[in-house]
Amino acid sequence: MEYSRDSAEMMMETKRNVYSLEDNKIKRHKSSDLSFSSKERKDKLAERISALQQLVSPYGKTDTASVLLEGMQYIQFLQEQVKVLSAPYLQATPSTTEEEVEEYSLRSKGLCLVPLEYTSEVAQTNGADIWAPVKTPTSSHAFNLSSSNSPFQ
């Protein structure tokens, strides 16, 4: 068993070395062709690191490793804050069936929600005439009691 593990490790090491040699050749080839753009990339990276340094520790360390480490720690802190603050809202609600919903619904009790504007007249009455039918004429001519053809004379 020991022999097979050692040979597997040696094979992996060999593979790594082959890939790293190929990568170095590719990197050298690219760097000679794109030296100007890599300078621009380095400048952009430096600008962004300094902006991050201003956010994370404006009066502290200025080396890149410290700035990135503090940035990572601050992001982790913010992620934990999001978890803590959103935990009450993300708690699993028990699944309810339609029967349970109807048991607690207003319609099952013969009630419904009405906008407040519609209830102002009801609030001003004594309650006795709420269910009384409202007698409003459909036309002024239809309910003229003084006319000769009225059945209520």
From Swiss-Prot:
GO CC, any one term: nucleus
Chain ranges of the bHLH domain: 29-78
UniProtKB keywords: DNA-binding, Nucleus, Transcription, Transcription regulation
Compartment(s): Nucleus
Main location: nucleus
Gene3D superfamilies on file: Helix-loop-helix DNA-binding domain (4.10.280.10)
Family: Belongs to the bHLH protein family.
The name this protein goes by in its record: Transcription factor bHLH154
